[in-house]
Amino acid sequence: MEMLQLSINKHLAAQADSVIIVAGDFNHANLKSVLPKFHKYVNFPTREKNILDQVYCNISNAYKASPLPHLGLSDHLSLSFIPAYKPLICRQKTATKTVKVWTEEATAALQDCFEVTDWGVFAEGTDLNGHTSAVLDYISFCTENVTESKTVKVFPNQKPWLNSEVKTLLKARDTAFRSGDPQSYKDARKNLRRGIIKAKRSYQQRIEAHFYSNNSRGMWQGIKTLTGYNNNTTATISSDSTLPDTLNQFFARFDRHSENSDTLPVPPTNKDLLQLQPHQVRATLRRVNVRKAPGPDGVPGRVLKACADQLAEVFTTIFNLSLLQSVVPACLKSATIVPIPKRNTVNCLNDYRPVALTPIITKCFERLILPFIRSAIPADLDQHQFAYRANRSTEDAVIMATHTALTHLDQSNTYVRMLFVDFSSAFNTVIPQKLVMKLSNLGIGSSLCAWLLDFLRNRPQRVRMGDRTSSTLILNTGTPQGCVLSPLLFSLFTHDCSPIHPTNTIVKFADDTTIVGLIKNNNESAYREEVKHLTDWCSNNNLVLNTAKTKEIILDFRKSKKTVLPTLSIKGEEVERVESFKFLGVHISADLTWAVHTSYQVRKAHQRLYFLRKLKQAHLPRPLLVNFYRASIESIL
């Protein structure tokens, strides 16, 4: 039973939506003792007065069981099972969504409208919050007036090649079937087959046209649609009306009130005041990605990009007022969280990944602030932080860690302990006051520090699931997700997390932190003090160590090594020792060979060969197949 349980659980882990049927002569064994979520289907005797034969399935009411006479000399009855369930694709409801239809006339009308608008009236008799809200509301109002909203249905089995002509032929076939005329039905089916072939060929030609016109984005979209590449099935949205509020509380669980004990930066002065120019704002608006979803303000990126010339002046005024007053309007730092299931089967709140939607205009503001922060940071700051730095990548971090270990292992009587630290929601636990104090100590001006402090505090947040929205919570902790400044701010927050012993190295890539302890003559005191120092640093900076996900590898090639080296504990909890660990995309093994990593990459390449075969079956041209192979398969080998 245990072997059967392990086999079934392994299959469900890989394909959570699959249907599993287990049938056989179980005698008096009960599969529900090890798989309680499976359902029995035989409730009548199969041999004399005993139920010895049984069928289990992970779907309830999937089949209707009935007895049949035994076959030949068998003393067991035969069993008949008739499907009594609807397939998953039939059980999924048709989704409807509203899309805005943009025309050239709509864009021109918006530009003309904003060109003649007197933006000064929005600032009269109100503060910066009211001024900004009025401007954004006016832009949204004008956008609604010049665009048309269209409601479309999205079916669970929607095919990319399905067009209006095929839909018309489908209706004609159904009409012919209901008419009862065999010849009409035969002709309608023939026309439908021809229409589908024509639609598929047209879709294929459209993908080829993207390839030959160097439209890489359109080409890859078509390829992914044809193959299902990176097409993750999302879980069904729960019908629980309280789930959005519950998730909002869960995502805000690290929030804490402002600490008055923390010394705040000195008030800003005009000496270090930042000033933005209209041409800078205009250039940033023109670089907006129009495909990004709008934030809570509802202003789409397409409006900001198309009307950059008309909106540059008013947003320059708002941005400079914000920098002058060191105040960020609440509407610019609000966020809507859209929970995305991490896996098909959601069992707990932690199975949802929060995806934050923030105003696009706020991202533009952040991009304008970013160069000022970078210019104030010393060039040699935190040389072992490899994230969000020019000319640095994950490969550099992996090379640093492995090179440090290998160089030490060349010496006699040495070994290396590598601790891969895991934080719980690291970005969400940053205390703004502590961050701003560190920025001030790094030489960033008091005006910018005060602005950043207000940017990180009193942030409205709500959760949206379908057509349901939670109540709003105000957050005062963490660097907001989906913002341009957050990654850099977090890397600056951890710049003082440095080793206290020269025999240890701390390699950082954002919140991925690794301690490389170089040990000689079995003296681990420096390494263990380093771990203790990191634990204390995390406690002082409100970062939560997740010991359960923290792993350790020991690299020891000594011939006379001890059989068992002492374990490592963090706050009384033992750290798991593993033989290999996936570090920034590379599997590092205790024997420092490439066997585990190579096997993983080969398996990944084999999986992607399936997509290549799907494209070949779609009769795509050879150059496009070669392009897909080089980008998706050859690149990982």
Language-model features: where?
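Basic, alpha-helical interaction scaffolds
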Residues: 105-140, 343, 573-637
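Catalytic palm subdomain of template-directed nucleic-acid polymerases
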Residues: 31-32, 423-442, 513-539
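Surface-exposed loop/turn segments and immediately adjacent short secondary-structure elements
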Residues: 86-90, 94, 119-122, 126-128, ...
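Short, conserved micro-motifs composed of acidic
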Residues: 29-31, 47-52, 57-61, 66-67, ...
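Active-site regions of metal-assisted phosphoester/phosphodiester hydrolases
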Residues: 1-35, 41, 64-68, 74-87, ...
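Active-site palm subdomain of RNA-directed nucleic acid polymerases
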Residues: 11-14, 20, 369-385, 408-409, ...
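Conserved pre-catalytic core of RNA-dependent polymerases
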Residues: 267-480, 517
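Arg/Lys-enriched, amphipathic patches
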Residues: 22-23, 28-29, 86-237, 287, ...
